[in-house]
Design a protein with these regions (language model features):
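Conserved helicase motor core of P-loop NTPases
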Residues: 1-87, 97
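C-terminal accessory regions
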Residues: 90-185
Length: 185
């Protein structure tokens, strides 16, 4: 409810494009893997008119927010103006525009209007991006950053990590959780 109703009402942000959840971990209740699964079902639930593909333990569904997770200098893209080129890079985010089960490909529209087709065998180059690690967010900015605060392993619970997360937000930063964890850093 916080992500889908209260925060968008308070900040005026769109849950998919304007907001980013940042967390220090990949695993656990507040890790990227779990948060992405929960947020996908909340923000982009399965529907009759949304095609999807299951790849390993991930479901990619039309409308999902995704991120390129490694540089690919050979991946071709096409822009709306008809220009084309090559290269999609680690950390770039976009949205699944189409899942073509006949041609076995997923089309992603990146934030700069580049359209990229991923054959199913290349789906390991993208992952869901409703939540990303603080580390993966370095160098990026978002209108609103949402940071869940809980117990994290001491190696991750550092002021530098929180500083990095907080400085990713351009307009709003929302930290949710217990204050004693935050104060202990």
């Amino acid at each position: 409810e916080l992500v889908t109703k209260r925060l968008p009402k308070f900040t005026g942000c769109d849950g998919l494009s304007d907001m980013q959840i940042l967390t220090p971990m990949r695993k656990g209740t507040l890790g990227v893997q779990n948060l992405n699964t929960v947020l996908q079902e909340t923000l982009n639930p399965a529907a009759f008119d949304k095609r999807e593909v299951h790849f390993r333990q991930i479901v990619f569904r039309e409308g999902d927010k995704v991120m390129q997770i490694k540089n690919n200098y050979k991946l071709e893209y096409l822009k709306k103006d008809g220009t084309s080129g090559k290269g999609v890079f680690n950390g770039e985010t976009g949205q699944v525009a189409a899942v073509n089960q006949e041609e076995k490909k997923v089309t992603v529209c990146y934030d700069d209007d580049r359209w990229v087709d991923y054959p199913y065998i290349q789906l390991d180059e993208i992952e869901l991006a409703y939540a990303v690690t603080v580390h993966k967010s370095q160098g990026s900015e978002f209108e609103t950053v949402f940071i869940p605060m809980s117990w994290f392993p001491p190696a991750l619970a550092t002021r530098n990590l929180i500083y990095t997360a907080v400085t990713r937000g351009k307009k709003n930063v929302v930290i949710v959780g217990r204050g004693d964890y935050f104060n202990a850093m």
